[in-house]
């Protein structure tokens, strides 16, 4: 009985070491300080690539372009 508990413990610890973010595209996305989403990017972020072995989307914060009115030359 003790052996079965020990084997169950070893199996659960071994399976917890599997990394779901092991894809190369995910690593590149996180290195550029972007985020990965499985569905769609939030409305304030733009999709720039893939994550999770092309099953998700790599999202980057959208840059807001604010136009400053220029003074007219007289």
UniProtKB/Swiss-Prot annotation:
This is Beta-defensin 39. Only expressed in epididymis (caput, corpus and cauda). Residues 1-23 form the signal peptide. It comes from Mus musculus (Mouse). It is found in: Secreted. The keyword Electron transport does not apply. GO terms for biological process: defense response to bacterium. Has antibacterial activity. Keywords: Antibiotic, Antimicrobial, Defensin, Disulfide bond, Secreted, Signal. Pfam families: Defensin_beta. InterPro entries: Defensin_beta-like (IPR001855). Its main location: secreted. One of its GO terms (cellular component) is extracellular region. Disulfide bonds join 29-58, 36-51, 41-59. The keyword Methyltransferase does not apply. Belongs to the beta-defensin family.
